UniProtKB/Swiss-Prot annotation:
This is Protein FAM218A. Residues 104-127 are annotated as: Disordered. It comes from Homo sapiens (Human).
Length: 157
């Protein structure tokens, strides 16, 4: 059983801006999400996984369904991050299965003024330095980062 990919706010089980339904359908071959297909066998009790410096992660089973809510605790606040719903997946049924647009960019943009060899040689060019904000991948916005901290060989999955 695999999940279906639906972007933010369109999950019928847990509606709201913070509810997600996500699918490993497009990237089930990747190691970090290999085990989500077997996740429906979890008992009805929460699992707390250690997330290192990112707080703790809990995987809760929605009673009566095969829906899993991953929650994380940071500064004692609990927020719903991803809902894994077991439903049949076909390529045409999940139009938003491609998550490439929802994962924040990790590579910093190439900014002008950081290369010593730019411009014609011999001419002094006025250099403008563009300072951008520090680049981080936020743990609350990107889909890929939300499941990134689950241990790969975890017996829970």
């Amino acid at each position: 059983m695999e999940g279906c990919a639906v972007r933010r706010g369109s999950c019928p089980l847990l509606p709201g801006p913070s509810a997600w339904r996500a699918s490993p359908a497009g990237w089930a071959g990747r190691a970090k999400l290999r085990s989500w297909c077997r996740a429906s066998g979890l008992p009805n009790r929460p699992y707390t996984l250690t997330g290192g410096r990112h707080g703790s992660v809990s995987l809760l089973r929605h009673p009566g369904t095969t829906t899993f809510v991953q929650q994380r605790s940071l500064h004692q606040s609990w927020e719903k991050r991803i809902v894994f719903s077991a439903c049949p997946v076909s390529r045409s049924w999940c139009p938003e299965r491609n998550f490439s647009g929802s994962i924040p960019a990790v590579t910093p943009p190439k900014l002008p003024g950081h290369s010593k060899s730019e411009g014609p040689p011999g001419k002094v060019r006025k250099r403008t330095t563009i300072r951008s904000q520090p680049l981080f991948v936020t743990r609350t916005r990107g889909f890929g980062s939300a499941v990134g901290w689950l241990p790969l060989g975890s017996p829970v999955l």
